[in-house]
Amino acid sequence: MPPYRSRTTTHGRNMAGARGLWRATGMKDEDFGKPIIAVANSFTQFVPGHVHLKDLGQLVAREIEAAGGVAKEFNTIAVDDGIAMGHGGMLYSLPSRDLIADSVEYMVNAHCADAIVCISNCDKITPGMLMAAMRLNIPVVFVSGGPMEAGKVTVKGKIRALDLVDAMVVAADDSYSDEEVEAIEKAACPTCGSCSGMFTANSMNCLTEALGLSLPGNGSVLATHADREALFKEAGRVVVDLCQRWYEQEDATALPRGIATRAAFENAMSLDIAMGGSTNTVLHLLAAAHEGGIDFSMADIDRLSRHVPCLSKVAPAKSDVHMEDVHRAGGVMAILGELERGGLIDASQPTVHAPTMGEALARWDIGRTNSQIAHEFFKAAPGGKPTQVAFSQAARWEELDLDRENGVIRSVEHPFSKDGGLAVLFGNLAPEGCIVKTAGVDESILTFRGTARVFESQDAAVSGILGGQVKAGEVVVIRYEGPKGGPGMQEMLYPTTYLKSKGLGAACALVTDGRFSGGTSGLSIGHVSPEAGEGGLIALVETGDPILIDIPTRGITLEVSDAVLAARREAQLARGKDAWTPLNRKRDLTPALRAYAAMTTNAARGAVRDVSQIERG
């Protein structure tokens, strides 16, 4: 049997010094034979999705210790993408994912912890912790802070549900008065929790359920609801059980790589496609699979996207539906249940809470279980009062949303669309692929031919859109914003938001080697690979060039002759050391960002680190 890792620091005469230090943290003689379990928290007062996590690490710790373990808490950083959006702060968002993964590895390996409970929530924190979990391959349970309640506001005589993106859209819409914009701003984010739509944070927290690494409801129980407390407590108990199964019984299904297998990653991607998740999830699933040594690529995502239907549309794809509505319809377990009935997932995969996903669905899918516990659990509703306090309300819906024909979650027989909510496009403009969230694209522009309007940065694009340079029928091309070229692969939420506010949301396309916020909708195509900064064809596009986007055939083509492109490439190479860098863009980069750019890879590889790029030959 594998020895407990922690015994490296707790056993033997030569570890007297280490034990002395452990004792100074509160450990006693009887603790030195117990598993030491790291509680990786991500509390910060900068991020509404994390502002309520301060005491939750100790809540988990108490359950770990009651179950026979020793809990030791530490914190990672957390960047708020919404606050970092639209300025130089966004350069740090994606790099923070790697920093979070490394920080978890550093703490866990430096102190020889036996297992981890990952308390995550927002955009890069769950992916960073997931990468660390797959890299370390020791027992782990994920529990997130939970979604924010949707805002409610009365504007122009109508009550409407809203979220962060609504505030951004109306701020650039001159038809709204300053007073109306202020009212929406104040109502958009009423509580603690991750932003209320199917944006990146909530998408990733849903995907940990599909991977089998978190408990049912992790992706959908509101941060404010009393029911969420049970998830934190159960996580503490489950991780001790996983420890015992691995270290005392050598049960490999207690490990992340034994649970989050290739089949589980396919399950997670199928869920993502079915629920129209954020395009960022593609980036993060590729990275997590890479850390676990799992062969999972854009080709696999393309294959899945061609036969998994769209079973749910949530904001931003459907502005009046939010995570609280998904939960009422049965949450992730209900979507997985519909996919399983359609033969679209492998339900034989293990989870941290059940021997197989199939057994978990039998208990938690409200479409097949009569369990009063499950039905009551998914009736957890918003409290409707602004708060930053976790578990502070216990409201219930009077009834569940069990309508699989017209409800928030549909059956395979009654999908929103037969094609899923995400698609991978290939073509000369993106030989290694690019991503579009089809759930947010108007059917009238699924095939779109337009002329390029090229910008060398997000800032330039924003100025061009707001300044009236962009016209209907154009393809806005924003380049040199990839992982290397940015660096940091900024989110393009402001350009897409401003296109929408200018009435161009269904009249223009946007193509970039950067990425998009989970709040993006419209014909927004990101992750173009290879990126401009590594010599990708997107660097050769000129304003006026015709571009064909054909989602039904999964194609994206720059309609310029090979001879013209070859001449442009020669001209680019003639720039010498300045080749494949933007013109007329000055961006001061710190050593931290330059180091990230030197080691990162393109989006088709998940923007993972490849140190061979800087190693001596």
Swiss-Prot record:
Catalytic residue positions: 517 (proton acceptor)
SUPFAM superfamilies: IlvD/EDD N-terminal domain-like (SSF143975), LeuD/IlvD-like (SSF52016)
Gene Ontology biological process: isoleucine biosynthetic process; L-valine biosynthetic process
Residues that, per the record, bind Mg(2+): 81, 123-124, 491
Induction comment from the UniProt entry of this chain: Positively regulated by the IlvR protein.
Essential cofactor(s): [2Fe-2S] cluster; Mg(2+)
Keywords, in A-Z order: 2Fe-2S, Amino-acid biosynthesis, Branched-chain amino acid biosynthesis, Iron, Iron-sulfur, Lyase, Magnesium, Metal-binding
N6-carboxylysine modified-residue sites: 124
UniProt GO cellular component terms: cytosol
Reaction equations catalysed: (2R)-2,3-dihydroxy-3-methylbutanoate = 3-methyl-2-oxobutanoate + H2O; (2R,3R)-2,3-dihydroxy-3-methylpentanoate = (S)-3-methyl-2-oxopentanoate + H2O
Binding site for [2Fe-2S] cluster: 122, 195
Sample GO molecular function, one term: 2 iron, 2 sulfur cluster binding
Cofactor note: Binds 1 [2Fe-2S] cluster per subunit. This cluster acts as a Lewis acid cofactor.
UniProt pathway: Amino-acid biosynthesis; L-isoleucine biosynthesis; L-isoleucine from 2-oxobutanoate: step 3/4; Amino-acid biosynthesis; L-valine biosynthesis; L-valine from pyruvate: step 3/4
The EC number(s) this enzyme carries: 4.2.1.9
One Pfam family cited in the UniProt record for this chain: ILV_EDD_C
Similarity remark: Belongs to the IlvD/Edd family.
Subunit and interaction comment: Homodimer.
Function: Functions in the biosynthesis of branched-chain amino acids. Catalyzes the dehydration of (2R,3R)-2,3-dihydroxy-3-methylpentanoate (2,3-dihydroxy-3-methylvalerate) into 2-oxo-3-methylpentanoate (2-oxo-3-methylvalerate) and of (2R)-2,3-dihydroxy-3-methylbutanoate (2,3-dihydroxyisovalerate) into 2-oxo-3-methylbutanoate (2-oxoisovalerate), the penultimate precursor to L-isoleucine and L-valine, respectively.
Name this protein carries in UniProt: Dihydroxy-acid dehydratase
Gene from which the chain derives: ilvD
